[in-house]
Amino acid sequence: MTHIAVLGSTNMDLVAYVDKAPRRGETVTGRDFRTIPGGKGANQAIAAARAGATVSMIGAVGNDAFGPRLRSTLEHSGVTTDHLRTVEGPTGTAHIVVDDEGGNAIVVVPGANGTVDHLVPGDEGLIASADALLLQLEIPLEAVLAGAETARAHGVRTILTPAPARPLPPELLAATDLLVPNEHEAATLTGVADPFAAGAALLDRVPRVVITLGAAGSLYLTRDAEPLAVPAPRVTAVDSTGAGDTFVGALAVALGEERPIREAMAWAAAAAALSVQREGASASMPYRSEIEARYTS
């Protein structure tokens, strides 16, 4: 079974559901509100575990009421939390508005995630024992870089989701095996709007790129082959929160199982398609049997 380590954020998502997202200065009435465990790191960990991997989470929660709930959610999905530490202060939160088309806008408050600025004893050994390391940018960049360099030193595949998008140091990109931005993040990193051109520009910095394109599917680019476009299943989206993390978690599992890249992307797209038909981030993530049924249908 593929062993995946995830170094990243754990947040409680505070989700308001509205008919139409408010404009600046506008107040609207929501139709529902929920607190849902999330955070890009935790989401990817849960997605990978439900997709069939052995998963370990490295990160931090606060000593508030949200911390134990997040830990319990991870463990219930099969994620090992021995390296998820509890620190003084609040757990990270994500304040999310979801409109009636399934689109969202998100503000993240780091909380305990801001304390994950270095690896602690035991983290390096965990990363070294994994088949892949999943990274995102909701924790301090120092820890992301330390994780990537540790993975490279031990021959562990590193998959980086550059979100929230920001300028990235060359040494982090040099330690990245696969970069998985969405089209907006790819444009932010390169200054190029067209995903094919943005992907080509990113290949100057990383060996392989998968750009997620929402309902349009995903695009794979590498230095030694033609670009590969893989469509997404056609579904009606209810809530797109966490869809990208679902894709990354499932993709990591498929690659760990040595599936060809086209099959791995299509399998991950099937997982993401299932997730957008349900509300919430981690709550929407499908199990392996569901992914297989969707993929083969």
Where do the protein language model's features map onto the residues?
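Conserved phosphate-binding/catalytic region of the ribokinase-like
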Residues: 1-4, 167, 195-297
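Short acidic/glycine-enriched loop/turn segments that link adjacent beta-strands
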Residues: 89-92
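Hydrophobic packing within well-folded, soluble alpha/beta domains
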Residues: 48, 57, 70, 74, ...
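Short glycine/proline- and charge-enriched loop/turn segments
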Residues: 22-30, 180-182, 228-231
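Glutamine-centric residue-chemistry signal
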Residues: 44, 136-138, 282
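Ribokinase/PfkB-type carbohydrate-kinase core domain
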Residues: 1-10, 68-86, 96-229
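Nucleotide phosphate-binding site architecture
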Residues: 13, 187, 282
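Glycine-rich phosphate/adenosyl-contacting loop at the front of the ribokinase-like
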Residues: 1-60, 65-76, 236-238
